[in-house]
A protein has these predicted regions:
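Conserved, single-site charged/polar hotspot
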Residues: 1-234
């Protein structure tokens, strides 16, 4: 494997905060994308704003999957539905028709920094009651009404060094996320994939130490890289 991101066929969502006792649900990634967009934004917004927000939502989720953010902490899911940590997902809800159509078009497109391999950790908030370093959801509506394209909206909030990765390959779970929690002593192909990814990411973040032996064994060097990675992306 190249260590390049795949679009997962499915994603496992924890229906609560990370440490909260709550069920997990596994849904097709495209279904997840349509659900989050229907839960986070409004279908009546200008299409440029909807597209920009959906690209941020997709990239955020793919960053969680690609980096094994929760799996490397010993959890058995990829992402939560808590807006305190991740993005809103309402299990079983109906989705809006125009958003469903856009999800079918966009689910295998994401944003990343030029020269980086990992999908952008594209934080966002509503921009009215909550503000943050990332995109303002309501601010994106104003920019769309001012004639901004989805890409220009994204660069207004995340910086100009963005590129869209289109038609990313869809992979099985083996290509995308660890299937079980990873910890010191784990030895399997999931660990090997994690090692490849951490070494790729460390090209852009030199504070993350290189793992000298990509051998699928979760030993001290891998643990040190995971710890530094978690500090960087926390």
């Amino acid at each position: 494997p190249t260590g390049l991101p795949y679009i997962p066929e499915s994603i496992t969502v924890h229906l609560g905060r990370p440490d909260e006792s709550a069920p997990n649900v596994t849904v097709p990634f495209q279904t997840y994308v349509a659900n989050v967009a229907s839960s986070e934004i409004y279908p009546t917004w200008p299409e440029s704003a909807i597209r920009a927000n959906m690209l941020a939502q997709i990239s955020f989720a793919l960053n969680r999957v690609y980096t094994g953010y929760y799996r490397t902490r010993g959890y058995d899911f990829d992402i939560t539905n808590s807006t305190q940590y991740d993005q809103y997902f309402v299990n079983g809800r109906d989705v809006f028709e125009n958003i469903q159509q856009l999800a079918a078009e966009l689910f295998n497109t994401y944003i990343r920094r030029v020269g980086n391999v990992e999908p952008l950790f594209a934080q966002y908030c509503n921009g009215t009651t909550v503000t943050c370093n990332g995109m303002s959801q309501w601010g994106s509506v104003d920019l769309a009404r001012a004639g901004y394209t989805p890409y220009r909206i994204l660069t207004a909030y995340y910086g100009s060094d963005l590129e869209l990765v289109r038609n990313a390959p869809v992979g099985t779970v083996q290509n995308t996320a660890p299937t079980s929690p990873l910890r010191l002593g784990s030895a399997n192909n999931d660990v090997r994939l994690l090692q490849i990814r951490l070494n790729r990411i460390s090209n852009n973040y030199p504070n993350i130490p290189k793992i000298p032996y990509v051998n699928g064994i979760f030993a001290d060097a891998t643990e040190n890289a995971v710890r530094e990675f978690q500090k960087t992306f926390n």
